[in-house]
Amino acid sequence: MKDRLDDILMDFLESTLEPFPLSALLRFMGEAATAENYEDLSDYLSYNQLAYLNPSWNGEEPFWISRAGLFTGRTALIRPGKKELAAGVFLPGSRLVPYQDPSYLPHELTFIHNGRILPRVPYETDPDEAYPLYSFFGEEYVPQYLSLDNSANDLLFSDSDGADPSCFSLMAVDVRDVYWSGVFRAGDFLAAKVVDWAGGIFELSVVPAPEESDRDEWLGVLEESLVQEFDSIGPSASMDEQLAFSFFLGQELLFNENAVPVGDLLGWSERVDMEPYGVETRLWHKGSVIPAQS
């Protein structure tokens, strides 16, 4: 029964893009609108960060928004590396965090341009280039993500000596038509717009980088939203969850034309950095120990 209800719940959250009251979700699940069910469902959504609550100040039932609703139609910014530009490719890595459905691996995402699905091509790389592109999954998990990219990597990264291979191949997105069409200029960003969150589909285009002052203002909002997240929720279950909640807090102050790649925050901020959390990694107050959670 629980599995069936979980499936129904996820169907609703993945397909409902507009804010919704819990009463609508309970009806969809075929559950009674009792105080106990309201409380249980609210706790479940909040604990697992499946949806976010917009409090009501007028006594009416508050509304929630799903991650699909929060990020559909929104655009992640990516700064291609020199090697990617030269090869005409793009490595998704964790650069779509927190915009993407976290159940998708990077090689499972779909990218379109001018109405055409962009193919994947093998791209030779090494740890120095690839690891930073996967950093928001946590450094400790990067080898697992790389090993799952293709069958050859599964063998390379399962070598019993424990050392990661010095070079390997990843299935990159072929974006030659995007880079080399005459539209892309030095300093431009790839813009990946979420067109189907549950389907893992993004539409690629090219946008110019914002002015430095606008960039700094945007990064300041993201920084402050993360600090609020640390102080109100704690380290969460992943950096993806931390960033997703921060974008919920910032919303239109972050979903605008001044956006830059999320990873830019780490070289810019004096307040936020990646810090160890047991054997894992989280975003946290820079230089501070993350307290154990009860």
Could you describe each region identified by the protein language model?
Residues 1-294:
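Acidic, low-complexity intrinsically disordered regions
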